[in-house]
């Protein structure tokens, strides 16, 4: 748990344990389980507390070897905005491969999927909409003909035009958009996929 210089944080150990338990419900049929290996450590550091992805070296200075290091911070600055979680795809940054950073505000949620989403990235899963964060800009075709080279590059995942809160119903979690792919076919994305933004 990262605190400010005075030891103040907005998250409790119980909230973190609940987040891990929620992530484990998604992993139940996969024979994987997230466990806390030791006592939860506290790091008092203002710069790390308000984490910016440009400050990655601060993470590595505090890492424990041979485990996944989870950092719970007050905020994550990412480009021109903020992120709920942050990690590295395998092979991109070996030095930081065993790190997940979580925004405290995205953790205190009874149906949070941010932690398991970030573990998905750790296991080399991409977003279901692919590389772009621009709405309706995925290059994957609805018919799946380019599924191995576009979108998330997983062929059993339907093409996703970047589903999010603005095009998913808060009542039934159904996609409400009317975007079409390059062939004019309507997207029918899976809103329950943890690697989507729904």
Predicted region positions:
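Propeptide-to-catalytic entry region of secreted or membrane-anchored zinc metalloproteases
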Residues: 1-68, 72-77
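Short, exposed beta-strand "edge-strand" segments with a Pro/Gly-rich flavor and a Y/T-containing core
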Residues: 5-11, 98-101, 198
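Glycine-rich, flexible loop segments associated with nucleotide phosphate handling
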Residues: 12-13, 61, 93-98, 148, ...
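Generic detector of leucine side chains in alpha-helical contexts
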Residues: 17, 27, 32, 48, ...
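Extracytoplasmic/secreted envelope proteins and their assembly/folding machinery
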Residues: 17-20, 24, 99, 113-116, ...
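Intrinsically disordered, low-complexity boundary segments flanking structured domains
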Residues: 21-24, 53-60, 84-92, 168-185
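Active-site-proximal segment of zinc-dependent metalloprotease catalytic domains
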Residues: 57-135
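The catalytic-center signature of Zn2+-dependent metalloproteases
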Residues: 105-198
């Amino acid at each position: 748990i990262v605190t400010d210089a005075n030891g103040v944080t907005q998250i409790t150990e119980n909230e973190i344990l609940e987040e891990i338990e929620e992530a484990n419900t998604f992993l139940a049929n996969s024979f994987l389980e997230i466990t806390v290996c030791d006592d939860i450590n506290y790091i008092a550091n203002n710069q790390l507390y308000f984490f910016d992805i440009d400050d990655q070296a601060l993470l590595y200075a505090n890492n424990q070897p041979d485990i996944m290091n989870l950092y719970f911070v007050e905020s994550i600055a990412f480009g021109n905005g903020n992120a709920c979680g942050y990690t590295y795809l395998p092979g991109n940054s070996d030095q930081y491969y065993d790190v997940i950073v979580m925004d405290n505000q995205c953790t205190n949620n009874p149906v949070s999927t941010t932690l398991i989403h970030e573990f998905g990235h750790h296991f080399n899963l991409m977003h279901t909409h692919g590389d772009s964060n621009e709405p309706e800009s995925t290059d994957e075709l609805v018919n799946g003909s380019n599924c191995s080279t576009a979108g998330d590059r997983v062929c059993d995942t339907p093409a996703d035009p970047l589903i999010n809160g603005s095009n998913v119903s808060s009542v039934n979690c159904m996609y409400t958009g009317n975007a079409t792919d390059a062939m004019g076919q309507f997207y029918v994305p899976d809103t329950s996929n943890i690697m989507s933004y729904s």
